[in-house]
Amino acid sequence: MSAPKLLSLGCIFFPLLLFQQARAQFPRQCATVEALRSGMCCPDLSPVSGPGTDRCGSSSGRGRCEAVTADSRPHSPQYPHDGRDDREVWPLRFFNRTCHCNGNFSGHNCGTCRPGWRGAACDQRVLIVRRNLLDLSKEEKNHFVRALDMAKRTTHPLFVIATRRSEEILGPDGNTPQFENISIYNYFVWTHYYSVKKTFLGVGQESFGEVDFSHEGPAFLTWHRYHLLRLEKDMQEMLQEPSFSLPYWNFATGKNVCDICTDDLMGSRSNFDSTLISPNSVFSQWRVVCDSLEDYDTLGTLCNSTEDGPIRRNPAGNVARPMVQRLPEPQDVAQCLEVGLFDTPPFYSNSTNSFRNTVEGYSDPTGKYDPAVRSLHNLAHLFLNGTGGQTHLSPNDPIFVLLHTFTDAVFDEWLRRYNADISTFPLENAPIGHNRQYNMVPFWPPVTNTEMFVTAPDNLGYTYEIQWPSREFSVPEIIAIAVVGALLLVALIFGTASYLIRARRSMDEANQPLLTDQYQCYAEEYEKLQNPNQSVV
């Protein structure tokens, strides 16, 4: 496959423009015929003597243009179509050279800073706080809702998306790159869709659906962490508000109601259609993207910026599945955090004793795999019963953001408790896209799962204001504790009684005469010694 065709998508994916600021150059520079054909995406930062004179900010020592490093270790055998998907060995099907930034510099041209840093020299630490949406003031809640709506309606100043696969990225004439503008929030939706879409095998062939670069594997938590981080940074730039942070929804309430589904927050239920959002909420006006699955799967097209129908949501309304009519319990989170191994073979949705599979929701909260169970993250999605419960569409419902910030908070607490133990995050043989060093699809510049497997306050510039529930004892544990307690009580009573008996005996003995008929007198011994028939030694 020619370099230009491969490069197309890479440009579109400048979601990664790690923390790109509005004043910096847009990776759209790489969505040109020249860039696509060269396989190089190393834009200038501040060219003085013409194009190509300051690639990656090289003149100021910020970075340099280097070959892309991509993980080529083997993946698990469940994906049998090697060579058929643009996302394989990401991003080499699109770009083979990118900016490698020095120190705390980052971005597509090394013009910005790594997470947790800011300033002209990227030498100032920054820490923002993600808080519970329900704990925000009225003004803060309104600000967050307005910011989301603004992101939905604001064209992304930095990124464009590909609307065709790599083979067709330059258009029918081979000279027209197939990219589109898209809003900031819809870009957030698009990147998620692209990571979960089926593998197109050709017209007339059924697309392969047993592939997912962001779910059902070790990368689930790291991928969604970066996904949120990218949106948060984009919204900070949009608002020109560096301290803006994404709040979270603590969905572990055990209730059968959505406590954030009110018109002043994420929208209540419509009185006219129980599956729609109330017209009193701004989110009732939102329209979804990436819903043309039949075209994607049969024609090989990609999701574009076209918006379709409204968001559907009917919390606790799936009467056919009673198990998804109630949200997770607080104790489910407490139990999940006691699962000490990050992941276990086969590193998939049937892993047992895996923290990742537990918080993702394919195991019960104690870590035991059960094919009938949907818990925590999965249960919260299914509870919403609509757009938010369909993987390829779920980010269209803005509750997705809040649901995943809470999931990320659980992840960060696990990292803190277990010292970010990455030893059980596999280097190879995980599902495709989920190896430890794999570049997460479709972010650009490349960012690996490892880079997100760190505690957020120390490494990513944000922290959570949250109180974790302590684990309650189960009925069997309570019974066991009661039995042990009873045995200890019996032992204590027995020991006390024995002590009292011994003490009484000692007291009786103390009250007896010092010399009785039972004891010999020194006089008797003396008389024996005076007997001449006995020898004295």
Curated annotation (Swiss-Prot):
TM stretches of this protein: 478-501
Swiss-Prot/TrEMBL keywords: Albinism, Copper, Disease variant, Disulfide bond, Glycoprotein, Melanin biosynthesis, Membrane, Metal-binding, Monooxygenase, Oxidoreductase, Signal, Transmembrane, Transmembrane helix, Zinc
Modification(s) after translation: Glycosylated.
Enzyme Commission number: 1.14.18.-
Cytoplasmic side: 502-537
Gene3D superfamilies listed in its UniProt record: Di-copper center containing domain from catechol oxidase
Binding residue positions for Zn(2+) B: 377, 381, 404
Extent of the signal sequence: 1-24
Binding-site positions, Zn(2+) A: 192, 215, 224
Membrane topology value: Single-pass type I membrane protein
Family named by the database record: Belongs to the tyrosinase family.
Function: Plays a role in melanin biosynthesis. Catalyzes the oxidation of 5,6-dihydroxyindole-2-carboxylic acid (DHICA) into indole-5,6-quinone-2-carboxylic acid in the presence of bound Cu(2+) ions, but not in the presence of Zn(2+). May regulate or influence the type of melanin synthesized. Also to a lower extent, capable of hydroxylating tyrosine and producing melanin.
Complexes and interactors: Monomer. Interacts with ATP7A. Interacts with SLC45A2.
Name of the protein described by the UniProt record: 5,6-dihydroxyindole-2-carboxylic acid oxidase
Protein's organism: Homo sapiens (Human)
Lineage: Eukaryota, Metazoa, Chordata, Craniata, Vertebrata
